């Protein structure tokens, strides 16, 4: 299991992290592009690849919730 060191609030939010990370894993499995998984996870999911993967994995109905979870996990980015 890979722990994303970019996510400052991973501890105590493991279930939330796993749901957000699943988007990146699923996207990487679908497209099989080198670096996609790491790019999706970069900056604790605060990036355009993560947003693209939400759409690509047909999770747009959950987009707002996923973005909120990513923001919670990466609180302190700014």
From Swiss-Prot:
It is found in: Secreted. GO terms for biological process: circadian rhythm; neuropeptide signaling pathway. The keyword Isomerase does not apply. Its main location: secreted. Produced by the medulla terminalis X-organ in the eyestalks and transported to the sinus gland where it is stored and released. GO terms for cellular component: extracellular region. Keywords: Disulfide bond, Hormone, Neuropeptide, Secreted. One of its GO terms (molecular function) is neuropeptide hormone activity. Disulfide bonds join 7-44, 24-40, 27-53. InterPro entries: Crust_neurhormone_CS, Crust_neurohorm, Crust_neurohorm_sf, Hyperglycemic, Hyperglycemic2. The keyword Disulfide bond applies. Represses the synthesis of methyl farnesoate, the precursor of insect juvenile hormone III in the mandibular organ. PANTHER family: ION TRANSPORT PEPTIDE, ISOFORM C (PTHR35981:SF2). Belongs to the arthropod CHH/MIH/GIH/VIH hormone family. This is Mandibular organ-inhibiting hormone 2. It comes from Cancer pagurus. The lineage of its organism: Eukaryota, Metazoa, Ecdysozoa, Arthropoda, Crustacea.
